[in-house]
Amino acid sequence: MKVWLSDRNLKLAALFGASLGYCAVALLSLMPAAYRPHIIVVSDKLEHAVAYLLLGALSALAMRQPRHVHRLALAIVAYAGILELSQLLLPSRVASFEDFAASAGGAIVGVSIGALLIRRSATR
């Protein structure tokens, strides 16, 4: 019996999820504010942190190389910064350092969680 949750399939699923996540985050970050849905009603900062936490974890799982996670975290933080700065060019959006900080924090935590999961699965 072949297991469909092989390491290769998990990596592909994480890569697919991360790719969809990057597209969704870009779309939600750059669309007019009036049309943007609020998924977490409590705080938009929490939305940023959770979105980038998921991106970081899925990206780390797709990468499967824990020794390079610091570069991955830096790349995701740069992505968050570019999207936040891009909002300065849009009339219906407002860029804020607090949003960037929440995104960066979520990305770092997410990549760390992904790296821990990779290391844990490697020791089994």
Locate the predicted segments by residue.
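Bulky hydrophobic segments
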Residues: M1-F100, A104-R124
